[in-house]
Amino acid sequence: MGLKKFKPVTPGRRFMLIPDYSEITKTEPEKSLLVPLKKKAGRNHHGHVTVRHQGGGHKRMYRIIDFKRNKFGIPARVASIEYDPNRTARIALLVYADGEKRYILAPKGLKVGDTIMNGPDAEITVGNALPLANIPVGTIVHNIEFIPGKGGQIARSAGTYAQLMAKEGRYALLRMPSGELRKVLVTCMATIGMVGNEDHSNEVHGKAGRKRWLGIRPTVRGMTMNPVDHPMGGGEGRSKGHIPQSPWGIPAKGYKTRKSKKPSDKLIVKRRKQK
């Protein structure tokens, strides 16, 4: 996995840094694990925009990913490492000994031909999934469950991981990708290693068109809008007149938006590191 730099033959190529896709071993996805994906353009069932800056982009099919890793005791062979347009990580196609095929997130270092196991008796090797109770302290993990059996929810993006810091009674202490220290039940599953494609954060699209191919539309600054459109709009020339805030009037800098008295507060030992 590396990044490709180009000769500046056009303005769009000058600063472009994109993956070389050297880890991809198969270009066609497994048809049995595909489902149609309808475009929403950031709209809800009323047709109102609920997520800004979305729309257009290349047509996609959704790849069904196994986040639960609940097929215990049956070895699986890594058949291919593939590109997934719906996420930043690469995905790996597993073929289990009984013939079943499943996609998982491809961790760093996983290669075609490797054997993977799920369950409490699996070895501590990259790609294997175990309950936190069976993972040694200090291990780097990803695709971590919050609720046993629900499937991994934490550390699923390219290059992310959490670290198992301690185990005490029913809970394991994890250092999250954000730096937050949080308790998670030891019966929750996690996968050994960090998510692959770790150079994703260094990518440079180079031109607006590449963002449009991804379905990302332009972001307009509030200060350039009219007062009807944004709290920071209006005025003569470039005039703020307000503290930086969202289109709905919520302060944008330093204001805590987490709901107070959340039940999960008791599981957070230390808040994430501040910017």
Swiss-Prot record:
Pfam families per the UniProt record, alphabetical: Ribosomal_L2 (PF00181), Ribosomal_L2_C (PF03947)
Domain of life according to the entry: Bacteria
UniProt keyword list: Ribonucleoprotein, Ribosomal protein, RNA-binding, rRNA-binding
GO molecular function, one term: rRNA binding
SMART domains on file: Ribosomal_L2, Ribosomal_L2_C
InterPro entries with a match to the protein in the record: NA-bd_OB-fold (IPR012340), Rib_uL2_dom2 (IPR014722), Ribosomal_uL2 (IPR002171), Ribosomal_uL2_bac/org-type (IPR005880), Ribosomal_uL2_C (IPR022669), Ribosomal_uL2_dom3 (IPR014726), Ribosomal_uL2_RNA-bd_dom (IPR022666), Translation_prot_SH3-like_sf (IPR008991)
Keyword Membrane: no
GO cellular component: large ribosomal subunit
Biological process annotations from GO: cytoplasmic translation
Positions of the UniProt region annotated as Disordered: 221-275
UniProt xrefs under PANTHER family: LARGE RIBOSOMAL SUBUNIT PROTEIN UL2M (PTHR13691:SF5), RIBOSOMAL PROTEIN L2 (PTHR13691)
Sequence similarity: Belongs to the universal ribosomal protein uL2 family.
Protein name: Large ribosomal subunit protein uL2
UniProt lineage: Bacteria, Thermotogati, Thermotogota, Thermotogae, Kosmotogales
